[in-house]
Amino acid sequence: ATDIRQVVDSTVEPLMQQQDIAGLSVAVIQNGKAQYFNYGVANKDSKQPITENTLFEIGSVSKTFTATLAGYALANGKLKLSDPASQYLPALRGDKFDHISLLNLGTYTAGGLPLQFPEESDNTGKMISYYQHWKPAFAPGTQRLYSNPSIGLFGHLAAQSLGQPFEKLMEQTVLPKLGLKHTFISVPETQMSLYAQGYDKAGKPVRVSPGALDAEAYGIKTSTSDLIHYVEVNMHPAKLEKPLQQAIAATHTGYYTVDGMTQGLGWEMYPYPIKVDALVEGNSTQMAMEPHKVNWLTPPQAAPLDTLVNKTGSTGGFGAYVAYVPSKGLGVVILANKNYPNAERVKAAHAILSAMDQ
């Protein structure tokens, strides 16, 4: 067997130097067995070393948790993906959201909701008014434009359908049912000593700042040990209770394709094996920033056996990447306290997965 430590070391050490990353943690899983590789520090001042229990902001990887919560509502018969968005929020009734489905919101196809809320609307008080005044650029279901306000609203409405606030449902129901004990939206006082300091492009300390639907779109903080457990239950959900098995199946369903990528709920999927360039391309800035015509899969299709499932996530001071291949039982998680380019995360993960799949 390949010496995984050697592969991870030789991949991560030059990467951290080139990208000036203070701290980074890698978790891999193979045949149900997790291994951890930790590098550098969680905080440049205190020099606290990174461990597999260090908490990182995972940015948009949070979208996969939001999708799982929505899948849980779906499994419990509280919503249908075909329902109009306005059904769950009276303030949006009688207008465009009567013609935009929950699935459109969950897959970034509502009609051009932007990547971020505009600054003046980026708070809970202004949020509803933002959606009421938003003018679609495209017909619903025609174009994919990756968007926090889109999947954020999806999560918010899913929580409405379950009759509880999103944060409460996530922290008290969904995360415990997934077996995640060190995954938080709000990091409790008792865990703050584990919360890494993030560093921006200039190396200045930074933490995620509050915004509209932040919990739903980019609010999770977790460790590589919890995240690799999450990967394992995504690959082998049979140990979970039935509604969560169904929830995970919904997130791994392909709803449409854009070029080589199949869009799930939260997760993005590719045929495996995949060349590194194709995976880099699917996680490119262009893919995140520009609209792309979608080809709907009717009916939606369960992921084929050999599929790589992945998601990137970033905040001002953190960079995350998760990738796994359920048919092989292989997964990798890479968390860092710096927002460095997605291409570098993907290349590192691809090298590690390829070495494990020898």
Curated annotation (Swiss-Prot):
One MF term in the entry's GO annotations: beta-lactamase activity
Q: Which GO terms describe its biological process?
A: antibiotic catabolic process; response to antibiotic
Q: Which residues form the active site?
A: S60 (acyl-ester intermediate), Y146 (proton acceptor)
Enzyme Commission numbers on file:
3.5.2.6
Q: Which Pfam families does the entry mention?
A: Beta-lactamase (PF00144)
Q: Which UniProt keywords apply?
A: Antibiotic resistance, Hydrolase, Periplasm
Principal location:
periplasm
Annotated localization? Periplasm
Question: Carries keyword Ribonucleoprotein?
Answer: no
UniProt catalytic activity:
a beta-lactam + H2O = a substituted beta-amino acid
Q: What class of enzyme is it?
A: hydrolase
| Positions of substrate binding | K311, T312, G313
Entry's Gene Ontology cellular component terms: outer membrane-bounded periplasmic space
Entry keyword annotation includes Hydrolase: yes
Tell me the protein family, please.
Belongs to the class-C beta-lactamase family.
**Role of this protein:** This protein is a serine beta-lactamase with a substrate specificity for cephalosporins.
As a miscellaneous remark, the entry gives: The class C beta-lactamase family has a specific amino-acid numbering system known as SANC, for structural alignment-based numbering of class C beta-lactamases, or else the simpler name structural position. A multiple sequence alignment was used to derive a consensus sequence and then the consensus was numbered taking into account insertions and deletions. This allows use of identical numbers, e.g. for active site residues, despite differences in protein length.
This one is known as Beta-lactamase
Name its species.
Pseudomonas fluorescens
Protein encoded by which gene: ampC
